[in-house]
Structures are given as structure tokens and as C-alpha cells.
Amino acid sequence: MSSPSRSVSLFERAQKTIPGGVNSPVRAFRSVGGTPRFIAKAAGPYLWDADGTRLIDYVGSWGPMIVGHAHPEVVRAVQQVAADSFSFGAPTEAEVVMAETLCELVPSIEQVRLVSSGTEATMSALRLARGFTGRDLIVKFEGCYHGHADSLLVKAGSGLLTFADTTQNAPSSAGVPEDVVKHTMVLPYNDADALREAFARHGKEIAAVIVEPVAGNMNLVRATAAFLQAMRALCTEHGAVLIFDEVMTGFRVALGCAQALYGITPDLTCLGKVIGGGMPAAAFGGRRDIMGFLAPLGSVYQAGTLSGNPLAVAAGVTTLRLIAADGFHDRLAAQTRKLVDGLAGIARDAGVPFAADSVGGMFGLYFREGVPTSFAEVTQSDVGRFNAFFHAMLAEGVYLAPSAFEAGFVSSMHDDAVLEATFEAARRAFKAV
């Protein structure tokens, strides 16, 4: 593969006007080292970088591109809407269709509010939970990332595992006062006993528990059914709001989201990524009595100039229609499992300590023995070995997430030929680590 000379020059240029040369930290390749690839275009399961090099894409814009890049029906829907202007700042029929679609696909959502980012969704859901309960304390879990709102930047996984000191139960970012995060209690992921103790001591103070039912921002870590069941029971018993952050898992692991896989009904759900089809879109919704506290009906304020943006809604509604096809998620899950099983077999043949797991169209690669079940176990992965593997795969034309602490994503366009090309690359790459 040729040297990414155009990406090198673009990165040098970008750093003059953009902090770190990127608009989201993980894109800078700081975790893995080297120069980030600047992308010129994408189609199906492929990216083309600024030098014209084609790459098999397992990032998928960090999850949204579940039907592949530039799907013709999604592109056509956006083009048709764009001809009538990009934004109105007023209600549209299309956003009603989006809301109806979300409520139909996710039974726990009785009403929904559209926003523009996952951070807005989680931030607003927590404000709503506090307004509804009249309480302040929020419970989150180590390694779960819920966006970059101040009160949630505590042991938050994702890029913060690369950029922050994770040994302290303190803000994971400069600029976040300790007075802000004092209302956030951080507990170990998958530890139901710790959650029971927290409720025993602080049950009357806890407004909400927020969780990724499948964590995707400390690599991929599944919640156990017992953990989520205990969480649901404790929230019900103590009058706290259970919030599932399904910004990443929503519609990617199942048509009914992770809550359908586990059979757990949250009070509020946060969505994003897939519901925008690659455009900036997110949402939060749930029980009607809770959602009724939102302005203009209630006293909990939330607003957004571009909320329900027509272009994003068009892309999202079309994507949701495509993935609602019979068998879509069964095929996606089977293909993703085929990918991780194949990679695990190749690593085993190469004698490399390695494990892999998948849920729906998400997957995790771990340079360690055994699939991790907690934040602590994830941080025991061999980051140096992952970094070497990442660069070896990139040199072979396979683009993985540039961090040992991020999940990967498969689209419906990753067919057997794409997987076999990935396996051929991996056979050579594992020899380099």
C-alpha cells in the first residue's frame, strides 16, 4: 500500500487551525500513533482516503452506517428533501413520522424528543429524570461513555481511556469542577451487589441510573442479564428513573434495540447514530408521564435550533425502513459473528493471546485471554499489541477503530468476499504482532 502522503500534508495543515488537527479526539490516532487517514469518499463497506487508497471500513462512522456508506435510497431521500431547503426551525410532518417510527419499534418509548447528538440526548434525559424525581444524584458505571456533558465525564471510557488518568474517581477532563461531578456516583460495571449497596445507602437521593446495556466505549462489554434485572428492580423499588443509553446499541444490535435482546424495559431511552443514517440526529424518549415534564408542557427546559432537521430525519427514516426488512438483523449478527470467529481462529493459529465477541452488528477485539466483563478487565488488554495489529491491518487495507478501547461495526454490505479479504489481511497482520 502506498504512503498516505496526502493525509500527512492535510494533517499538518489541519493542525494550524483545528486543535490537534481533528474535530473529535480519537480521530487523531494519538492512541495508536501515526498520522490519521483523511477520507475523501465512501461507498458500501469501503472508504477511500485522500490518496485514493481503498480501505475496508470497520468503523462505519462509529456506528451509524449500518446499511453501508452512500446507500442509494438514503442518498436519494436526502437529495429530495434538500431541494426544499435544509432547515426550517418549525415543525414538519417528517419529524412526526420519525417519532411514530421510533415509538413503534421501541415499545418502551411512548413519547420522544428529537435532538442533534448523543450528548444532547443523555444530558437532556438526565435533566428530565432530575426534574421528574426532584432528586440530584445520578448513578453511572465505570467505562460507560454517555457523551461529554460535564456531569458524566467521570471514568467515562471511550477516548477518555486514552487521554485521562483513569485511576481516580474524579473528573476525566480538565475544566469539569468537582462540585459538578459530586452528584455523579460511579460504580463497577456488571456489579449488582455494588448497585444494591448504593441504593441501600442513597436510594432516596438517586434520581436516575444510566447505563450502556452493551458498553461500546470501553471496547465491547456485555452487561449480564442479572445486572440489568437488578437495576430494573432497584429503580422501581426506590422510584429512580432507569435510563438505557442506546445511542450506540439502538437498532444496531436488534430492531428493538438492546432492551429487546435483554427483555428489560427502561423508563427512558437515548438513541443516536443509526437513527440519523449518518446525519447528525439523536433522540430521547420513554414513559409518557416522564416526558410530560418537558417544556413546553412542563418545567424541564430543553431546546435545539436544528432538532428534527429535515435532512437528518430523511436519512434516518429511510435507514430505519431498510433495517426493518425481514431477517436484516439476523443476517447482520451472523456476519459479524463470522468475522470475530474468523479473526479469533487466525490469532489462535498465530499463537497470539486474543479474544473477540459480538452482539448484533457490533464487535470487540481484545489482546488478552478471555472476553472482558468489566472496565478493570478491559484495561488489562495489551494495548501495544493492539496498536501493532491496527497498523498492520491498515497497511493491508483494513480500517479498524484507532483505539484499543472502541467497539467495531459491521454493515449489511460486508459480504463474504469482504470478510475473506479481511481474513487474508489478518493472517499477515497477526504475524507482525
From Swiss-Prot:
It catalyses: (S)-4-amino-5-oxopentanoate = 5-aminolevulinate. Keywords: Cytoplasm, Isomerase, Porphyrin biosynthesis, Pyridoxal phosphate. GO terms for cellular component: cytoplasm. It is found in: Cytoplasm. GO terms for biological process: protoporphyrinogen IX biosynthetic process. The modification N6-(pyridoxal phosphate)lysine is found at K273. Its EC number is 5.4.3.8. Pfam families: Aminotran_3. GO terms for molecular function: glutamate-1-semialdehyde 2,1-aminomutase activity; pyridoxal phosphate binding; transaminase activity. Disulfide bonds: none annotated. The keyword Nucleotide-binding does not apply. SUPFAM superfamilies: PLP-dependent transferases. InterPro entries: 4pyrrol_synth_GluAld_NH2Trfase, Aminotrans_3, Aminotrans_3_PPA_site, PyrdxlP-dep_Trfase, PyrdxlP-dep_Trfase_major, PyrdxlP-dep_Trfase_small. The keyword Cytoplasm applies. Pathway: Porphyrin-containing compound metabolism; protoporphyrin-IX biosynthesis; 5-aminolevulinate from L-glutamyl-tRNA(Glu): step 2/2. Its cofactor is pyridoxal 5'-phosphate. Belongs to the class-III pyridoxal-phosphate-dependent aminotransferase family. HemL subfamily. PANTHER family: GLUTAMATE-1-SEMIALDEHYDE 2,1-AMINOMUTASE, GLUTAMATE-1-SEMIALDEHYDE 2,1-AMINOMUTASE 1, CHLOROPLASTIC-RELATED. Homodimer. NCBIfam families: hemL, PRK00062.1. This is Glutamate-1-semialdehyde 2,1-aminomutase. It comes from Ralstonia nicotianae (strain ATCC BAA-1114 / GMI1000) (Ralstonia solanacearum).
